[in-house]
Curated annotation (Swiss-Prot):
Active site as annotated: D113, D129
Superkingdom per UniProt: Bacteria
Membrane topology: Multi-pass membrane protein
Keywords of the record: Aspartyl protease, Cell membrane, Hydrolase, Membrane, Protease, Transmembrane, Transmembrane helix
Protein name: Lipoprotein signal peptidase
Catalytic activity field: Release of signal peptides from bacterial membrane prolipoproteins. Hydrolyzes -Xaa-Yaa-Zaa-|-(S,diacylglyceryl)Cys-, in which Xaa is hydrophobic (preferably Leu), and Yaa (Ala or Ser) and Zaa (Gly or Ala) have small, neutral side chains
Enzyme Commission number(s) from the entry: 3.4.23.36
Pfam families reported in the protein's UniProt record: Peptidase_A8
Biological processes per GO annotation: proteolysis
Gene assigned in the entry: lspA
Length: 150
């Protein structure tokens, strides 16, 4: 049952990410900003050919090699730790987010980012980035609370 749930979460995450990215590209000009919640959140369409804070900008080969490795490792750990909920949820979200951005990199050579926080200086991000970030936080919690690793 958990395998099916993991697959559903991954597919829903990827579909939501890709649909929203396509909507952004179709409705907002590159570099333009649409206010959603003044002084809190805007939509700003950018093409990101790097990672967070534009690190590794222009190094697509790095992500095209790294992402499949991360996916294989995450899938292996998901298989081994599926019974433990923190691992299960965290790794499932990491896989969904990694695949969402990987699809962009393969299809377009860059990742579409759009969420811009206005109350803090933070990199513009997308749904896949949210999935990855939440997944890594949950994975960290899983590692800290794992009785087998203590």
């Amino acid at each position: 049952m958990k395998k099916l749930l993991s697959l559903v979460i991954i597919v829903v995450g990827i579909v939501a990410d890709q649909i929203f990215k396509n909507w952004i590209v179709a409705n907002i000009q590159l570099g333009d900003t649409e206010k959603i919640w003044p002084n809190v959140l805007s939509l700003t369409y950018i093409k990101n050919d790097g990672a967070a804070w534009s690190s590794f900008s222009g190094q697509q080969w790095f992500f095209l090699i790294l992402t499949p490795i991360v996916l294989v490792v995450a899938l292996w750990f998901l298989w081994k730790k599926m019974a433990q909920n923190w691992y299960f949820i965290g790794l499932t979200l990491i896989i969904a987010g990694a695949l969402g951005n990987f699809i962009d990199r393969i299809r377009q050579g860059f990742v579409v980012d759009m969420f811009q926080t206005e109350f803090i200086n933070f990199p513009i991000f997308n749904i896949a980035d949210i999935l990855l970030s939440v997944g890594f936080v949950l994975l960290f919690i899983a590692i800290l609370t794992d009785k087998e690793t203590k």
